[in-house]
UniProtKB/Swiss-Prot annotation:
The gene is SPP1. Pfam families: S6PP, S6PP_C. It is an enzyme of class 3 (hydrolase). This is Sucrose-phosphatase 1. Keywords: Hydrolase, Magnesium. Its EC number is 3.1.3.24. Transmembrane segments: none annotated. Gene3D superfamilies: 3.10.450.50, 3.90.1070.10, HAD superfamily/HAD-like. Coiled coil: none annotated. Homodimer. Belongs to the sucrose phosphatase family.
Length: 423
């Protein structure tokens, strides 16, 4: 939250499974489209929040499987854990708040006699969350009985049912909605309330997000029955909540445009040749550079000299690139070598994407961008900590040039993708 000196232009708070992440999309296209949009347009002045029912263990597993961005804030375990930044620093104040009238041992003891409840794996059992599987046909009766039992014990607990099988018991003050309300209050107390907040979900444990006053909301097209039922009963007349006709992250992109919260055209949706922008935005230049790099190697742009010419037009004739292995090459020589790589990743589930992009202005017309550059092929991925220098150059066709690219390996991600980091 400290990355912004003032209010976020936009704060997106999104569920992960079947909302931000489409498990039926093997190419992860909608997720990558959102990532490119966020890094090119919003990363400098907005906040990205992931709100998931997953425990930290399963959340980290998902990040290894999918081309996800690093969020500014992560809400996990159905709103019982809040962490900040890449290091996932926990919010101790939130944990202390949840201890009120909560005794996990009593919850476990009082639910053991319900044969309909099957404990979820140990990784999903958290200090402020006890999680079970329950058949849909038994869910409502079990919820009622468990609630009565816990109430008699003097516990102030909440029961959330979602996904047609997941039953979570939490402190009454917990949940995705309460966690978001806590964050909004915390931002407001620092004088940084977001200008706009967009919440995004698909299942019952997301319903609370849509109940927070003033937020915009999108239920993705693949939203589950329990969330649609909640919407019909509680929010069908609220113009700030829509049911998208697009799946998962594509629905989030659609909602940004529907509510006029900002640009919603992803660099991945642009056709080459790119139109020259009216004003130069370094983040946009970096993201477009690597989107085109990926499309060249996947043979998703024509095999044309115009692509190689574009790369040379936006790179300095004397510029250099330093490979993670330490090899220093001319930028233009690297682009010439890229010409022979056209289509070498076609049909191989290859992707390249930018994460954690941060721009520093170093002069009146110069910038340095620092970011993680990921390349993946199937289940294998590599990552370099990258820096890229740009300067305005009015006489160049695009109005700017890249002068220097340098990469170093991210620990644990230094090998596996053949011919990685050509640029």
């Amino acid at each position: 939250m400290d990355k912004l000196s003032g209010s976020a232009r936009l704060m997106i708070v999104s569920d992960l499974d079947h909302t931000m992440v489409d498990h039926h999309d093997e190419e992860n296209l909608s997720l990558l489209r959102f990532g490119a949009l966020w890094e090119s347009v919003y990363c400098e002045d907005s906040l990205l929040v992931f709100s998931t029912g997953r425990s930290p263990t399963l959340y980290k597993e998902l990040r290894k499987e999918k081309p996800m961005l690093t969020p500014d804030i992560t809400i996990m375990s159905v709103g019982t854990e809040i962490t900040y930044g890449e290091a996932m620093v926990p919010d101790d104040g939130w944990e202390e708040y949840l201890n009120n009238k909560w005794d996990r041992n009593i919850v476990v003891a009082e639910t053991v006699s319900f044969s309909e409840l099957k404990l979820q794996p140990e990784t999903e059992q958290r200090p402020h969350k006890v999680s079970f599987f329950v058949d849909k046909k038994n869910a409502q009766e079990v919820i009622k009985s468990v609630a009565e039992r816990l109430d008699k014990c003097g516990l102030d607990a909440k029961i959330i049912y979602s996904g047609g099988q997941d039953l979570d018991i939490l402190p009454q003050g917990a949940g995705k909605g309460q966690a978001l309300a806590y964050l909004l209050e915390k931002l407001s107390s620092c004088g940084k309330p977001p200008n706009n907040t967009l919440v995004c979900g698909d299942s019952g444990n997301d319903a609370e997000l849509f109940s927070i006053p003033g937020v915009h909301g999108v239920m993705v097209s693949n939203a589950q029955e329990e969330l649609l039922q909640w919407y019909t009963e509680n929010a069908k007349d609220n113009p700030k909540i829509i049911h998208s006709n697009e799946r998962c992250a594509a629905g989030i992109i659609q909602a940004i445009g529907h509510f006029k919260l900002g640009p919603n055209i992803s660099p991945r949706d642009l056709q080459f040749p790119y139109a020259k922008e009216a004003s130069f935005k370094p983040t946009d230049a970096v993201v477009k550079f690597y989107v085109l790099y990926e499309k060249w190697r996947r043979a998703e742009v024509p095999k044309s000299d115009s692509v190689i010419k574009y790369f040379k037009n936006i790179t300095h004739a004397n510029g250099v690139t330093i490979h993670p292995a330490g090899l220093e090459l001319s930028l233009h020589a690297s682009i010439d070598a890229l010409g022979s790589c056209y289509g070498d990743k076609q049909g191989r589930k290859y992707r390249a994407w930018v994460d954690r992009l941060f721009i520093t202005q170093t002069g009146s017309d110069s910038w340095v961008g620092r970011f993680d550059l990921w390349e993946s092929e199937g289940d294998v991925r590599v990552c370099s900590l990258s820096s890229l220098a740009l300067i305005l150059k009015a006489e160049s066709p695009e109005g700017f040039v890249l002068t220097h690219i340098q990469k170093t390996w991210l620990n644990g991600y230094s090998s596996g993708v053949e011919q990685a980091f050509k640029l």
